[in-house]
């Protein structure tokens, strides 16, 4: 393969992952992890990235854009949101869901 082709191939293989950051953490409610399969959405720069919790209430979403965004948790028919920042490196955000007057709210742990 020609040197120019090798450079182009290397750029294509390594450029996308270098710009992506991981957002991960846990979601709890009432002091316990939420069940597996709770939908988690992260919106940054107009793009929406989705994931879901595992049996430990943990979630992990790869977000390509950097900057201010919103995390939304879809739980028991309600969808509270909380602001976050996406970086080019892994960032942890742990959240607590709380029910107040039949309204679900979310806050950082």
At which residue positions do the language-model features occur?
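Bacterial N-terminal signal peptides that target proteins for export
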Residues: 1-7
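Beta-strand-rich domain onsets/edges
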Residues: 12-22, 100-109
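Short, small/polar residue-rich loop motifs at catalytic or cofactor-binding pockets
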Residues: 20-21, 45-47
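Structural motif
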Residues: 24-35
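Short, acidic Ser/Thr/Gly-rich low-complexity loop/linker segments typical of extracellular
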Residues: 46-58
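Exposed aromatic-hydrophobic patches
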Residues: 58-64
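A short, solvent-exposed loop/turn motif at the edges and junctions
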Residues: 68, 72-91
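Extracellular beta-sheet/turn segments enriched in Thr/Pro/Gly and aliphatic residues
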Residues: 85-109
């Amino acid at each position: 393969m020609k040197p120019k082709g090798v450079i182009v191939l290397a750029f294509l293989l390594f450029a996308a992952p270098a710009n992506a950051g991981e957002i991960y953490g846990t979601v709890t409610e009432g002091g316990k992890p939420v069940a597996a399969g709770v939908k988690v959405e992260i919106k940054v720069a107009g793009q929406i990235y989705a994931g879901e919790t595992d049996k430990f209430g943990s979630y992990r979403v790869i977000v390509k854009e950097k900057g201010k965004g919103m995390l939304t948790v879809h739980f028991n028919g309600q969808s509270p949101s909380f602001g976050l920042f996406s970086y080019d490196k892994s960032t942890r955000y742990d959240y607590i869901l709380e029910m107040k007057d039949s309204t679900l709210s979310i806050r950082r742990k």
